[in-house]
């Protein structure tokens, strides 16, 4: 467990390496992005609750923490859980975590880079067309000893919010996995079936030495060699011909031109015939044609030629020599293997963030790496579940304040509340209904009539919510008795996983609980 307490710098080290790009490794970027541990500036939750913050935009960042002893996932569940808070949003960049592989050579924090071997990469990433929650694991080929990245198919979409978001990955020994966002399941599947490239190669492959015979005929249809062009087939007949049945309309002025010189136009005084040439009056539509059926020479309209046949070609027939589509013969795959337990990942020696982003002030907090999903859930209940209530109330208050400042009035405030509800419902429909039941009811009543909608949403605007923030000395203060007991129990159990648990879980506070209660009472 990592909560970024005051002694965090004793455990975490920034990288001094450079990231090389291009095939010839000629372009290098130093990992000089700044890291800091501080409280959030946007929608702060619990008093004194700080996290690891990526401070620089458009820079390479790398920071890591090595465990006292490696975590071995073999034969056990593996849980990866952490919080992300996108204080400035996420327009282009990553916010994922890497579980670093425990290798014989070991991991040197000063040299941590994109080349450092990792076991799992998990978390949000967005840039251009990319917008997904990564789940990548590196799998070792038992025949060659080489590692290959396996990417989850059809990944979940991340939650791009300025409030905290909880990402949880659970991998079971039966090779199943499940991804949760804010405790809601977003993606589940099997390591053996839902990754690309697949863990296990095919049992048979095309024979690379097999070649298509020179006399192989793979043209299914051919022109009939016995067919001849009919004697009455006229290839020169035009596609269209004049309509001989057409009659010139009455009133057609065939002797009148469509345009005439403008009788009112006069040659400009500055016009010089020697320099500018002979002057001609500009043309205007012939006024006599306005009421007539038409002017100028009458021409018959054209129609499709019934005798037209076009160029003759022989009809197609089945090719008597056709042998079908040629395919090489298959042979047993010499590189075939079957790994039935890819969830037996390589031992994990530490965690790290190796990121590039165009958005600064991305905050990470409350990291859990272990074997017990119930422990992770209990840890989230004492941390994330408490702060998110406070953060969402602040977000709602800010949204309402902005609507008032913009002079949106009653209709604008209704729209603001509805937009907030819709935004939350896209990520968590049930949670949105619980948090904003009046808006949910109002939208439902809209199907019965506009007046009902206005009345119900008006009820929403009748009251405001207040959030009281109280502080105590120190970064982390004592949790409520029951919560504190749960947190200590989680910390003691997690020690067996090899992950450092600093001073037990100390982020939940009586003050924090009081803030939630006060906010509810103020309503």
Swiss-Prot record:
UniProt region (Disordered), positions on chain: 191-275
Gene Ontology biological-process entries: ERAD pathway; protein folding
PROSITE patterns recorded: CALRETICULIN_1 (PS00803), CALRETICULIN_2 (PS00804)
Gene Ontology terms, MF aspect: calcium ion binding; unfolded protein binding
UniProt topological domain (Cytoplasmic) ranges: 462-523
One Gene Ontology CC term in the entry: fungal-type vacuole
Induction details: Expression is increased in the absence of DNJ1.
Residues that span the membrane, as ranges: 441-461
Gene3D superfamilies to which the protein is assigned, alphabetical: 2.60.120.200, Calreticulin/calnexin, P domain
Disruption outcome: Leads only to slight reduction of virulence. Severely affects growth and displays an altered morphology, when the calnexin DNJ1 is also deleted.
Pfam family, one: Calreticulin
Primary residence: endoplasmic reticulum
Similarity-based family: Belongs to the calreticulin family.
Name of the protein described by the UniProt record: Calnexin
């Amino acid at each position: 467990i990592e909560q970024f307490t005051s002694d965090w710098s004793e455990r975490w080290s920034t990288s001094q390496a450079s990231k090389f790009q291009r095939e010839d490794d000629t372009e290098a970027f130093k990992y000089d992005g700044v890291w800091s541990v501080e409280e959030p500036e946007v929608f702060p939750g619990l008093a004194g609750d700080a996290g690891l913050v990526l401070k620089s935009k458009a820079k390479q960042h790398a920071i890591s923490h090595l465990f006292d002893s490696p975590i071995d996932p073999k034969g056990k569940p593996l849980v990866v859980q952490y919080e992300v808070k996108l204080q400035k949003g996420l327009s282009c960049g990553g916010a994922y975590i890497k579980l670093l592989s425990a290798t014989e050579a070991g991991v040197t924090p000063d040299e941590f880079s994109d080349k450092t071997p990792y076991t799992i990469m998990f978390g949000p990433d967005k840039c251009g067309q990319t917008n997904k929650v990564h789940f990548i694991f590196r799998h070792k080929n038992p025949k060659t000893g080489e590692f290959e990245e396996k990417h989850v198919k059809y990944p979940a979409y991340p939650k791009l919010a300025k409030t905290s978001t909880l990402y949880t990955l659970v991998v079971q020994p039966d090779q199943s996995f499940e991804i949760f966002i804010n405790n809601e399941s977003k993606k589940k599947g099997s390591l053996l079936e839902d990754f690309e490239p697949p863990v296990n190669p095919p049992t048979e492959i095309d024979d690379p030495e097999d070649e298509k015979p020179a006399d192989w005929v793979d043209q299914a249809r051919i022109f009939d060699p016995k067919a001849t062009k009919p004697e009455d087939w006229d290839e020169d007949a035009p596609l269209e011909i004049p309509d001989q049945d057409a009659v010139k309309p009455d009133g057609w002025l065939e002797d009148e031109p469509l345009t005439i010189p403008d009788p009112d136009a006069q040659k400009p005084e500055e016009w010089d015939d020697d320099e500018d040439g002979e002057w001609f009056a500009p043309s205007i539509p012939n006024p006599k044609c306005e009421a007539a059926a038409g002017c100028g020479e009458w021409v018959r309209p054209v129609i499709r030629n019934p005798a037209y046949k076009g160029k003759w070609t022989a009809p197609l027939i089945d090719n008597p020599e056709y042998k079908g589509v040629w395919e090489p013969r298959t042979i047993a795959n010499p590189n075939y293997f079957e790994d039935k337990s890819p969830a037996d990942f390589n031992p994990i020696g530490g965690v790290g963030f190796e990121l590039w982003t165009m958005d600064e002030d991305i905050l990470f907090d409350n990291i859990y790496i272990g074997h017990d999903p119930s422990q992770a859930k209990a840890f989230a209940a004492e941390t994330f579940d408490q702060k998110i209530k406070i953060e969402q109330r602040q977000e709602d208050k800010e949204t309402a304040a902005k609507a008032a400042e913009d002079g949106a009035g009653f209709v604008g405030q209704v729209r603001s509340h509805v937009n907030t509800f819709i935004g939350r419902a896209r990520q968590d429909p049930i949670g949105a209904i619980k948090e904003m039941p009046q808006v949910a009811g109002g939208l439902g009543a809209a199907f019965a009539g506009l007046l009902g909608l206005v009345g119900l949403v008006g009820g929403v605007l009748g009251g405001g919510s207040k959030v009281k923030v109280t502080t105590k000395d120190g970064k982390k203060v004592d949790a409520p008795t029951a919560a504190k007991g749960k947190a200590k129990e989680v910390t003691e159990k997690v020690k067996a996983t090899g992950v450092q648990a600093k001073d037990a879980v100390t982020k939940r506070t009586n003050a924090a609980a009081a803030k939630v209660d006060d906010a509810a009472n103020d309503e």
